[in-house]
């Protein structure tokens, strides 16, 4: 996405080059800031996670990351992974992390990131975008709903889908220190 004015912020959204140190540094810094948010882990990333994050994203075969900039300053990130829908026999993109720095919130940066992901998904023939959001994160839910997201349902009478997780590491090795039973 070319640079555009979005509610007083000059936003440029680019697909990150995971071989570019400037991009990977911005990704790690933004994910670390996201981790410290009260609606995330509420604590910085562990040093070993910070050290492994860029190479882990680079080495994962389905990683797709978008960065939002205001001038030279990184202000948002969308970390995504390609998946596959067996019911549609088509690829999909899961937005695993979406974060905007606090002083750029409410200015359309999240929507610009979501639009960039959506454009890429359409280009790649994806059947849908998926994401998870805390029920209590009303602000994020509003943004997602305004962008066309809704709780996943397959049969209305069956109710909505739930996201579930099973930790595989012992408690002292879990990356998510605050939410018992989940890993981010």
Task: Name each region found by the language model.
Residues 1-25, 29, 36, 170-184:
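Conserved N-terminal entry element of GNAT/NAT acetyltransferase domains
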Residues 27-35, 49-54:
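Hydrophobic alpha-helical core bundles mediating ligand binding, dimerization, or RNAP-core interactions
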Residues 8, 12, 125-184:
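C-terminal "cap" of GNAT-fold acetyltransferases
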Residues 73, 83-95, 105, 125-127, ...:
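A conserved beta-turn-beta hairpin within the catalytic core of GNAT-like acetyltransferases
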Residues 65-67, 73-82, 94, 99:
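Conserved beta-strand in the GNAT
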Residues 100, 106-119, 142-146:
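Conserved acetyl-CoA-binding loop-helix of GNAT-fold acetyltransferases
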Residues 43-65:
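Active-site rim helix/loop that mediates acceptor-substrate recognition in acyltransferases
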